Amino acid sequence: MGRAYYSGSISSFLMAEEDRILGWLMIEDSFRTEDVQKNAWRAEIQVLKEQIASFPDGEIAFEFTIPRIGHRVDVVLIIQGIIFLLEFKVGDNTYAKSTKDQVMDYALDLKYFHEASQDRTIVPIIVPTEAADQANTLSLMGDGIAQVLCCNRHNIGSVLRQVLPQMHASPLSMDAWLDARYAPTPTIIEA
């Protein structure tokens, strides 16, 4: 199993059949995939096929494993060198603080321990699929991590189009990002 259950260009993702992508995700899942998870992945695939179609030059990864904490980011998008972390809550209708904290923890962990993320802008996004639209303002902290943006199933694409012109980065390939060294800070005993 690689660091992500599925990765590729957005254009390839858009052309692939939904069931084929779902199959790849299920093959990579080392646990017995429950129907709830299958349905969540199916919903994420459907939403993203609609919402990111205008970014065919970007790249996408599903279920990226963060080694230090053992959690998985639902979706990573790399568009124009910017890293977007999407945490879906399929069926939810509120922008929960716990979900914002969860995706921010992922962003912080990547920023400080993942070599290919350290000098990059990282934009964490929560996606409770049934939530009402919420206004978003891009606000970057000093370390290059944005405040969490809030999207639903209908506005991911428009939020990406709103924030991308405000940021600039050199190109970054998903393969290079996935293969980058993960180097946690040594503990006191190790130091």
Question: Where in this protein do the model-derived segments appear?
Answer:
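Accessory nucleic-acid engagement/destabilization modules that flank
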Residues: 1-185
